Amino acid sequence: VVFALSVALDMMLKEGIKNIFKRHARLGQMTRDGVKALGLSIFAEEGHASNTVTAITIPDGVDGKRLRQIMQSEHGIVLAGGQAHLESKIFRIGHLGLVTEDEIKELLAALKVALPKAGFAGVRR
């Protein structure tokens, strides 16, 4: 654990804390823009959106549990469900840590394929 922490801190020092925050802001915005382009709605108001995780409202007719299963089994991507009263109302995409722009692009492409399989008729081409 101590070695892993040392490696993580070295990586942070190398990138620089300001650059880390900029990267997270860029990835958060990229995720939100991509999700909206697919015809989905962001759960949080734009001014309150997180740069570490994006919560997406599950559209009517979409089985959120099935969507998460498809993403994991067919694309190797884990989406988190909502918690407590939001369990069946949202799913979450994490983009904190060592996440790249290419990984966000892959996630969005996979989501575009998986959504219709889970009942979403509104995927934009």
Predicted regions and their residues:
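Short glycine-rich or small-residue beta-strand-to-loop segments that form or flank ligand, phosphate
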Residues: M12, V53-A55, R92-G97
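Conserved PLP-binding catalytic core of the aspartate aminotransferase-like
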Residues: A25, S41-E74
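A common structural junction motif
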Residues: Q72-L79, K112-A118
